[in-house]
């Protein structure tokens, strides 16, 4: 039956506060959200018919098409049933038969925005979607297709609607590709962290004023006229990735959500530093969620941790140049009181609470000062702010020269960053739901950084000083090991008196930055995520220890997620995928292939920053509403700079930050209904007949079994990051005859094998060697003995003779007097082991087949072909742009030069 508008509007707000999705709309008719729409048109109006997921309740939105430059929207106050909406559409068709009747336009999944340029209004509609994840039973969607439709009828539009200026604005707005890295949810506030959603109450609808809602400006005309948010979608820009894992049969999901701020948003060289409102460029919040969907339970456990990245909060810039891939860095303005920097950190305290930990990864020493200029000024700014802040608001500043440490042979970047991450997590904590019944928790629980953690804070400051002085790797990691032992004892005592089932909350955040906040920052955020994941699994009872082996399969799965996130964020801000050498080395990829790919990324990023970022920045300013076209004013593309669009009092005032509140302050009425949906509800939910590709993402076949520790017995297929040689590099070298029958010294081979056997006898695993900060000799040895790759490869895959024969690799260099060799030789003397004893013809045929399948240098030839293809692509880009460097002219005379340099001069025949 039909229902009045007043009750419907209030009940939708109630539903939004509940957050828990309704499973039976018939028993709870007031709890619904509009998820599916159909757009119809007549000559005078658009009719947007929206329904809930189960198509039991329908609403109608009427959009007038008779005004060329006005937007007149009226919402029908009636809630219709399926029969009633069908009857209504028939009556509309009958009433408009004289003017063409009622025509179906498109199937729609929501309104992404409503834009006006010079005259006409346009509707931006989502016409195709796909589900990319699920948080606490709430579906998360990405956009596959979108469509822009003109609101006024073509017969009443003036010539302005078809002018060049109007068409160019329309094309510019359409260049913002909603199908890339935009996501939304109908029922879950994905723009807020899990902790914020749990602690929030009393909010009506989706918080469109949140800084991470990118279409806040575009949806404002519809939201203001309807006084609700049921017709529009709150789009978040960034990255979303979710995987389902299983540890010994216990299923859970790990979700990575990156949210890009719409304030001071833009491209790499056009948006740097901070603006007058304290907004920084490339401001991205990253949340890591772990949800335990254990079957049979009413409510599972959940945990999340938040970190963020952002440009250095100073007034600095770089100008893109066609002649310099690394432009000089300029400090545009000297602010003696660092007012904008102060506003930025106050905003972080408002968003995340205290403490704010700043991890600065830029260089300290350079031949030509670039990054070090910012490093000194940033340190001065933090020092000044700490002198005027109260002690509880002091910034924790850590500076570490990432590049300087990574260049050393014995560098273990992830180990150092992991130690810093552990310190940061001790100070900020993380969110854990605890037992579902325990919901009464006072705000005093949130004061994590009090007297009990002051020793850790002092160690953190001392550690920052050590890193800034550039201590050796052994000294730094030795200090980390000693402090880690002390932390373990303190943590054990703390855990004995702590109720592990009680809810925990995060207060404070780790803020990481380099110059671009892309490449180095992503490695540091992965190290933080890995340390946090161990604590999350431990809190949820999925692990016995709060640490995860860096060589484990679950660490590899998490690394893939952060690598995917880093590539997406780098593409948005920098124009290419992220530069990275740590992840490929850890994943065992061949160094030469990695170098060629990094080279192409540099070319692509250079091209994007030099030639396409200007138009991309204009599209962002138009989409976010920082520029609003007006008659008689200069067009967007005629402006010399967009600086005035983002200064105080113009751009940011469009979006008041009412919805941005500290996640560290609990409110009354905690949203206890926000919890994972039990697995049995997913198993028996009704699903329509659809394609296999869509269903496979939600079935159990997508669950990946992982381990919390490394599986050394299953190598070489596993990770070999601690051995000093990549698996695919070892495979290529082992296939070469020089490695199988080359001139390796017997004493070197025996010593290498013996060293591997000694480790096996002592029970020392590769993981323990990585965690042994005090002894890095094994790292330096692996670098010095590059010629013994074959023997070190065998030492990994072989077992000790004293441990038995199963799984052992018996080769020709074994001692003939050993018990195992005699046992093996005895089996070889059996008649069944001599297949060619009486058949010489079969023996010759078999030998010929072996010769045909002999592995030769074909792999090197394939690598040469791949390198030539990469270089040809680079040459094509350079020739199209006319920017081929002078020093690259000799490439044209020898196309194989790049491949020869990467693979080796002695392995590639020169082209004569």
Swiss-Prot record:
Organism (species): Arabidopsis thaliana (Mouse-ear cress)
Catalytic activity: a 1,2-diacyl-sn-glycero-3-phospho-(1D-myo-inositol-3-phosphate) + H2O = a 1,2-diacyl-sn-glycero-3-phospho-(1D-myo-inositol) + phosphate; a 1,2-diacyl-sn-glycero-3-phospho-(1D-myo-inositol-3,5-bisphosphate) + H2O = a 1,2-diacyl-sn-glycero-3-phospho-(1D-myo-inositol-3-phosphate) + phosphate; a 1,2-diacyl-sn-glycero-3-phospho-(1D-myo-inositol 4-phosphate) + H2O = a 1,2-diacyl-sn-glycero-3-phospho-(1D-myo-inositol) + phosphate
Gene (UniProt): SAC1
Membrane topology recorded in Swiss-Prot or TrEMBL: Peripheral membrane protein
Entry domain remark: The phosphatase catalytic core motif (or RXNCXDCLDRTN motif) from the SAC domain is found in metal-independent protein phosphatases and inositol polyphosphate phosphatases.
Name of the protein in its database record: Phosphatidylinositol-3-phosphatase SAC1
UniProt keyword list: Golgi apparatus, Hydrolase, Membrane, Vacuole
PROSITE patterns registered for this protein in UniProt: SAC (PS50275)
GO biological process: cytoskeleton organization; phosphatidylinositol dephosphorylation; phosphatidylinositol-3-phosphate biosynthetic process; plant-type cell wall biogenesis; unidimensional cell growth
Residue span(s) of domain SAC: 173-575
PANTHER family (alphabetical): POLYPHOSPHOINOSITIDE PHOSPHATASE (PTHR45738:SF5)
Pfam families on file: Syja_N (PF02383)
Names of the cofactor(s): Mg(2+)
Function: Phosphoinositide phosphatase which catalyzes the hydrolysis of phosphatidylinositol-3,5-bisphosphate (PtdIns(3,5)P2). Can also catalyze the hydrolysis of phosphatidylinositol 3-phosphate (PtdIns(3)P) and phosphatidylinositol 4-phosphate (PtdIns(4)P). Required for normal cell morphogenesis, cell wall synthesis, and actin organization.
Tissue: Ubiquitous with higher expression level in both young elongating and nonelongating stems. Detected in vascular tissues.
Region feature (Disordered): 1-29, 740-766
Compartments where located: Vacuole membrane; Golgi apparatus
Motif Phosphatase catalytic core boundaries: 511-522
């Amino acid at each position: 039956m039909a229902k009045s508008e007043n009750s419907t509007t209030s009940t939708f707000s109630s539903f939004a506060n509940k957050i828990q999705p309704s499973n039976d709309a018939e028993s709870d008719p007031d709890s619904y959200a509009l998820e599916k729409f159909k757009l119809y048109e007549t000559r005078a109006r658009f009719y947007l018919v929206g329904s809930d997921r189960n198509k039991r309740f329908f609403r109608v939105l009427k959009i007038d098409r008779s005004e060329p430059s006005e937007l007149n929207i009226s919402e029908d106050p009636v809630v219709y049933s399926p029969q009633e909406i069908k009857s209504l559409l028939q009556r509309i068709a009958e009433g408009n038969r004289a003017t063409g009747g009622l025509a179906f336009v498109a199937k729609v999944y929501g309104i992404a925005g409503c834009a006006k340029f010079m005259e006409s209004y346009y509707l931006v509609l989502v016409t195709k979607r796909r589900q990319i994840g699920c948080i606490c039973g709430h579906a998360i969607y990405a956009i596959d297709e979108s469509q822009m439709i003109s609101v006024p009828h073509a017969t009443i539009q003036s010539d302005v609607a078809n002018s060049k200026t109007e068409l160019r604005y329309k094309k510019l707005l359409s260049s913002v590709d909603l199908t890339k890295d935009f996501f939304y949810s109908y029922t879950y506030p994905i723009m807020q962290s899990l902790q914020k959603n749990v602690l929030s109450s009393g909010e009506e609808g989706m918080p469109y004023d949140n800084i991470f809602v990118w279409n806040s400006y575009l949806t404002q005309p519809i939201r203001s006229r309807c006084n609700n948010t049921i017709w529009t979608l709150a789009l978040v820009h960034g990255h979303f990735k979710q995987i389902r894992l299983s540890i010994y049969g216990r299923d859970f999901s790990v979700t990575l959500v990156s949210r890009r701020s719409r304030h001071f948003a833009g491209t790499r060289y056009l948006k740097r530093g901070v603006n007058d409102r304290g907004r920084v460029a490339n401001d991205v919040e990253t949340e890591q969620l772990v949800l335990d969907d254990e079957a049979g339970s009413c409510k599972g456990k959940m945990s999340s941790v938040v970190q963020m990245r952002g440009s250095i909060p100073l007034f600095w810039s770089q100008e893109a140049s066609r002649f310099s891939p690394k432009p000089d860095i300029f400090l545009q303005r000297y602010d003696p009181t660092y007012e904008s920097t102060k506003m930025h950190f106050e905003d972080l305290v408002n968003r995340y609470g205290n403490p704010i930990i700043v991890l600065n990864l830029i260089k300290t020493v350079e031949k030509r000062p670039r990054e070090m200029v910012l490093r000194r000024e940033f340190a001065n700014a933090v020092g000044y702010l700490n002198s005027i802040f109260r002690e509880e608001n002091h910034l924790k500043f850590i500076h570490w020269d990432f590049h300087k440490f990574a260049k050393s042979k014995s560098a273990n970047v992830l180990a150092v960053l992991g130690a810093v991450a552990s310190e940061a997590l001790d100070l900020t904590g993380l969110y854990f739901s605890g037992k579902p019944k325990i919901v009464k928790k006072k705000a005093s629980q949130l004061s994590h950084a009090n007297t009990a953690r002051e020793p850790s804070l002092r160690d953190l400051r001392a550690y920052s000083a050590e890193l800034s002085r550039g201590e050796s790797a052994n000294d730094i990691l030795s200090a980390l090991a000693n402090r880690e032992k002390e932390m373990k004892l303190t943590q054990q005592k703390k855990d004995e008196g702590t109720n592990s089932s009680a809810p925990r909350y995060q207060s404070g955040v780790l803020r990481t930055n380099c110059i671009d906040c892309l490449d180095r920052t992503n490695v540091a955020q992965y190290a933080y995520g890995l340390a946090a994941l161990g604590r999350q699994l431990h809190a949820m009872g999925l692990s016995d220890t709060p640490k995860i082996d860096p060589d484990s399969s679950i660490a590899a799965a998490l690394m893939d997620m952060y690598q995917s996130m880093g590539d997406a964020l780098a593409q948005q801000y920098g124009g290419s995928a992220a530069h990275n050498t740590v992840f490929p080395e850890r994943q065992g990829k061949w160094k030469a292939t990695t170098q060629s790919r990094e080279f192409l990324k540099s070319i692509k990023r250079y091209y994007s920053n030099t030639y396409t970022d200007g138009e991309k920045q204009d599209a962002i300013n138009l989409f976010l509403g920082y520029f609003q076209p007006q008659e008689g004013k200069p067009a967007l593309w005629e402006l010399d700079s967009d600086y005035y669009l983002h200064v105080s009092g113009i751009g940011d005032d469009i979006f008041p930050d009412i919805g941005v509140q500290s996640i560290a302050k609990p409110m009354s009425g905690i949203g206890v209904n926000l919890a994972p949906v039990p697995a049995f509800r997913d198993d028996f939910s009704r699903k329509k007949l659809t394609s296999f590709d869509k269903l496979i993402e939600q079935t159990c076949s997508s669950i990946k079994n992982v381990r919390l520790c490394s599986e050394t017995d299953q190598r070489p297929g596993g990770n070999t990051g601690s051995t000093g040689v990549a698996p695919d590099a070892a495979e290529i070298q082992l296939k070469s005859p020089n490695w199988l029958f080359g001139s390796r010294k017997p004493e070197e081979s025996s010593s290498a094998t013996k060293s591997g056997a000694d480790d096996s006898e002592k029970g020392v695993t590769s993981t323990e060697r990585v965690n042994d900060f005090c002894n890095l000799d094994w790292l330096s040895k692996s670098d010095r003995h590059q010629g013994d790759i074959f023997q070190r490869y065998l030492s990994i895959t072989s077992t000790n003779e004293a441990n038995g024969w199963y799984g052992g690799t018996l080769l020709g260099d074994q001692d003939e007097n050993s018990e195992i060799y005699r046992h093996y030789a005895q089996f070889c003397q059996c008649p069944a082991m001599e297949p060619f004893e009486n058949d010489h013809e079969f023996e010759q045929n078999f030998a010929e087949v072996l010769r045909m399948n002999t592995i030769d240098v074909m792999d090197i030839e394939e690598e040469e072909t791949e390198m030539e293809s990469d270089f040809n692509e680079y040459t094509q880009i350079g020739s199209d742009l006319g920017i081929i460097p002078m020093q690259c002219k000799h490439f044209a005379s020898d196309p194989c030069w790049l491949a020869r340099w990467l693979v080796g001069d002695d392995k590639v025949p020169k082209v004569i």
